[in-house]
Structure formats: structure tokens, C-alpha cells
Design a protein with these regions (language model features):
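Acidic, low-complexity intrinsically disordered segments
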Residues: 6, 30, 41-44, 51, ...
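Short, acidic Ser/Thr/Gly-rich low-complexity loop/linker segments typical of extracellular
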Residues: 6-22
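Short Pro-Gly-centered beta-turn/loop motif in secreted/extracellular proteins
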Residues: 22-30
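Acidic carboxylate motifs that coordinate Ca2+ or other divalent cations, activating on Asp/Glu
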Residues: 75-77
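Aromatic/hydrophobic beta-strand junction motif of beta-rich domains
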Residues: 185-189, 314-320, 354
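Short, glycine-anchored, charge-dense loop/turn motifs used at functional sites
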Residues: 305-306, 330-338, 365
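Short, surface-exposed loop/turn motifs with a glycine/proline- and acidic-biased composition
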Residues: 315, 342-373
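Short beta-strand edge segments in extracellular beta-sheet folds
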Residues: 344, 380-384
Length: 384
């Protein structure tokens, strides 16, 4: 955009496909040139950017260029803080479609310095008394929020993201839910190694989200976007890579069923709003999936502990179709193993008694029964 003291200005020209621009017949005046591009806020922005910005804020891995500092300053206050993460996460989750205090792009003048404390840049070229052609009046395009450089434009191909085969695999247990019932659905780890973050869109067919609770992963309402009754988005970013044992509860979804259904009929992941992907410790991009565990036809069944909650003692029971070995493990909400019992289970009903003194903790615990290919997890609560 070209500005001048003349009443015929400002004038605007569109750049060519390769990013060049040309203005003519403007001799003899003093001009100011700026560049701008609106919209497309989410282009190049993902939870991977949140991971990198978090590491920068905590001093674990600094952003390696001043242009990336401009990109990370999402709320345009001259510094990179947790507030920038909040604005970008809402964008990623689909809660907002624009940044409230910033444009989608900034265009520092090429060759000018970028201030870092506070973050500032020169976005205007001034030409006094133009009397001859001026060439190489260039700007640097900075996509706000995109610190890993994967924005897609017509000028340059985006930086190729490193792909990983280390995908995030999670699962939930099959169960029947009655119409109007509010249930807790633990999301457990199937393959969860060296994970720095993930994001996805979840469809809840015939159900609505009530809340989300932490397990191994510290999550809260800020990690979730409720787009509609049936569509929920999630974004999780960690400053350090997370490992979780198979069967460990990563987090728990609380949902309300609008009709009678099975969990397998209700939950599925896709990229409808927030693209489904994961990131490992090397910041490589992989897939994220959510499976549904079904009990084998033989009919092993793990029951809810009784009583629950409990103060002194509780009993965990399970049904076995045949005599077999089984492992009953108790975890805390971080995934740390509290106790493990190796059991020579008999055909029929088996019961194990746990006391508060044996467990040595209070609050929320999870217990998992494993026998052959069967795995099931339930929650117990110890009160003071």
C-alpha cells in the first residue's frame, strides 16, 4: 500500500504470484510503502508451534530467529508469554477464527533490525522526493503463530515437516450407555512414547461433553474446544516428552448420552476442525488414533470396586471363564504404579481386598486387570 500527502492516495497494488510488486508514475512526492495480508489465521499454526513456544518461554530451547519472535507474539504486546499460547490455542481449537489483538501476517522491512525487548519491527518504507526508479524495496512475510515455518503460500512451498512413524495410539473400553446417562470414559495409552503433544477433532455421535479430567496428562477445559454438542477439539502440548505405560489412564472424558448406544458407536477422531496429528520428542509429526477395546467372547469381566469411595477397605472382583493367570495393577493419576498383584485366578468370581494402608495414598486411583489379551481399567477413590 502506497501513501502520500496527495488526496489521490493511498493506492494499493496486488503482488504477483512470485511476491513481487511494481508501482509507477508516482514521481516527485514523498511516499510511504507498507504491506499487508489478512485472513487465513490458522494457516501454518498447530500445537507443534505451542510446543516450541512453550520451550522458548521456559528457556529450554530458544526460538532461533527474531522473525520467529514476531510470529510467537500472538497478542502483539511486544513479548512472548503464556498469553500468546492462550490466543493461539483458541485458534487451533476452533474456538476463535482470528487473533483478537493481532493481524494474521506482519511484514517487516527487509534488512532492518528486529527489536527483542520489546519485540518491535519496522513495517514502513519511506521514500522522500521520489525522482527515479527504486528497486529492491522488499518486505519479509511473517505468519503470526507459525514458528516452525510450515505455512503454505503461493510464493514458496512450506518447510517440509519431518514425519514420524512413532504415532500416538490411545483407546477406550467398549461399554453400553443408557439414554441420559452421564459416564466417565478413561482414555488409556496403547502406544504413548516420547510424546510432546497432539491435537484432533472428536465426534461424539449422540452425546455431549460434560468435562475432562487429568490422568497421566495434565489437562483441563483450556485444552478442549466445544464446537457443537457433537464436535469437540483437543490440543495438548508438553514442555518435556511424556511416556505412559500401556493401559495407563491419560485423561478421562465425562460425557452425557442423548440416546442408548455403545462407546464404539459414539466416539471417533478426525480432522474436521482441528487436524489430527501428534508430535514426538524430536518435533516430528505423526498420526494420532483412538481405538475401542472390546472384551473377548470368553467373557472376562472386571467389576467396580465395592465400596467406592472407601476409607479403610475395598474389594475388587472380576469374573474369569476359565482358570488363568492375571495381573491386577493399581496406578495413581500420574501413571505411577502403586501396587501390582500377580494372581492365579480361578474359574468364576475372584476377589482381591485392598486396604488404604496397603495402598498408602488417598484420592483418585485407577486399577487395571490384564489376562491374556484382555485389559480393563476402572477408577477407585480413597477418602480421608
Amino acid at each position: 500500500m502506497l501513501f502520500s500527502g496527495s488526496i489521490t492516495y493511498p493506492k494499493t497494488v496486488q503482488t504477483a504470484a512470485n511476491g513481487t510488486f511494481d508501482m509507477s508514475n508516482y514521481n516527485g512526492l514523498t511516499y510511504e510503502i507498507t504491506a499487508e495480508k489478512g485472513g487465513d489465521y490458522l494457516n501454518g499454526v498447530s500445537t507443534l508451534d505451542l510446543v516450541m513456544i512453550q520451550r522458548h518461554i521456559l528457556g529450554l530451547q530458544a526460538l532461533d530467529s527474531n522473525y520467529k519472535l514476531i510470529a510467537a507474539d500472538a497478542n502483539n504486546d511486544g513479548k512472548v508469554t503464556a498469553s500468546d499460547l492462550t490466543d493461539l490455542r483458541k485458534l487451533i481449537l476452533g474456538v476463535t477464527t482470528a487473533l483478537p489483538n493481532n493481524t494474521s501476517w506482519k511484514f517487516p522491512v527487509a534488512g532492518t533490525s528486529v527489536g527483542t525487548s520489546p519485540i518491535t519491527c519496522v513495517e514502513l518504507i519511506e521514500i522522500e522526493n521520489l525522482s527515479a526508479d527504486k528497486v529492491n524495496q522488499n518486505f519479509v512475510a511473517v505468519k503470526i503463530g507459525d514458528v516452525n515455518g510450515n505455512v503454505s503460500t503461493s510464493v514458496n512451498s512450506p518447510e517440509v515437516e519431518s514425519r514420524s512413524n512413532a504415532n500416538v495410539e490411545m483407546s477406550v473400553a467398549e461399554a453400553s450407555i443408557a439414554a441420559g446417562e452421564v459416564v466417565e470414559i478413561p482414555v488409556t495409552a496403547d502406544n504413548f512414547s516420547e510424546v510432546s503433544g497432539f491435537q484432533y477433532t472428536m465426534n461424539l455421535n449422540g452425546a455431549s461433553l460434560v468435562g475432562v479430567q487429568s490422568g497421566v496428562l495434565e489437562v483441563n477445559a483450556n485444552n478442549v474446544g466445544v464446537i457443537s454438542d457433537n464436535v469437540v477439539t483437543m490440543s495438548y502440548a508438553s514442555t518435556e516428552a511424556v511416556n505412559a505405560n500401556e493401559g495407563a489412564v491419560l485423561f478421562t472424558l465425562t460425557v452425557k448420552a442423548d440416546k442408548a448406544m455403545k462407546v464404539s458407536e459414539m466416539i471417533s477422531l478426525n480432522s474436521e476442525v482441528t487436524r489430527a496429528e501428534s508430535y514426538n520428542s524430536d518435533l516430528k509429526v505423526g498420526k494420532v488414533s483412538l481405538g475401542v477395546r472390546t472384551a473377548p467372547v470368553a467373557g472376562i469381566e472386571l467389576f467396580q470396586n465395592e465400596p467406592n469411595p472407601f476409607k479403610g477397605m475395598t474389594t475388587v472382583s472380576f469374573e474369569m471363564p476359565e482358570a488363568a493367570t492375571a495381573t491386577l495393577s493399581v496406578y495413581d493419576v500420574t501413571g505411577k504404579v502403586v501396587t501390582v498383584r500377580n494372581i492365579n485366578a480361578i474359574k468364576g468370581l475372584n476377589s482381591e481386598i485392598f486396604t488404604k494402608d496397603q495402598l498408602g495414598v488417598s484420592g483418585v486411583l485407577y486399577y487395571t486387570l490384564v489376562s491374556g489379551d484382555f485389559t480393563a481399567t476402572k477408577k477407585m477413590i480413597i477418602v480421608e
